[in-house]
Amino acid sequence: MAVPRQRAAGGLCGDGHHRFWLGPGGGALLAGSGRCRGGGLVILLDVPASMLHGGLNFRQVRWRAIGAILPGMAVGALIGLWLMGQLDKRWPLFLLGLYITWVGWRTLRHGQQAARALPGWTHHAGSGLVGVLEVMFATAGPMVIALLQRRLREVAEIRATVPVVMVVAASIAIAVLFGAGQIDRAHTFERWLVALPIAFMGVVLGNRLARHIPPPAMRRAMAVLLIASGLSLTQHLWR
């Protein structure tokens, strides 16, 4: 079933706006425009929109945290490609949604806490899950936020670092999916040319709004949007 243009445009602009605040990638698109039927488009939008977002906050990017995620993410992308033909996607999306909702609720309830790095194996598993999710669902952003919240204390650092991780994650996913012939090039690129300016507009609008929001309020907004993204993912179990 096709998504009405007005609704799709709203979802795209919302994703760009959402992305500037928090950088969560496809979460808003998934909720607003039926993500599971447009994964190639979402991933292709992730790269330029996240580059714009990251460029606007370049000085606050924490590169060491990105380097710690990269190896597991690359391996996870290959695992995700294999899993695409093996699993019913509804249950993984449901479980992911529960986890993201829990992370958002914990952040909303407890506020700012000292960053505590995850144990080595747990961090690598989470990094691998980022690659799996980006390839299978184009919605790894909430998981990236959950990981970075355990490594970075300042919300501004998280907001700046997430889109850089998403540029890399989406680039890996695009390479893997193109190599496997999983992206319909003709239709996807045609829609991409139309959707990209709308996503950029959302990023710019979010940029202006974010200047007037204090860090505690930004952290609460992050938590609320994580909860919204998580709950939207759980709905796929009944579709």
UniProtKB/Swiss-Prot annotation:
The keyword rRNA-binding does not apply. Keywords: Cell inner membrane, Cell membrane, Membrane, Plasmid, Transmembrane, Transmembrane helix, Transport. InterPro entries: TM_pro_TauE-like (IPR002781). The chain crosses the membrane at residues 65-85, 128-148, 160-180, 186-206. It is a multi-pass membrane protein. Induction: Constitutively expressed. Disulfide bonds: none annotated. Pfam families: TauE. Its main location: membrane. It is found in: Cell inner membrane. GO terms for cellular component: plasma membrane. Part of a two-component transport system composed of TsaT and TsaS. Belongs to the 4-toluene sulfonate uptake permease (TSUP) (TC 2.A.102) family. Involved in the uptake of p-toluenesulphonate (TSA). This is Probable inner membrane transporter protein TsaS. The lineage of its organism: Bacteria, Pseudomonadati, Pseudomonadota, Betaproteobacteria, Burkholderiales.
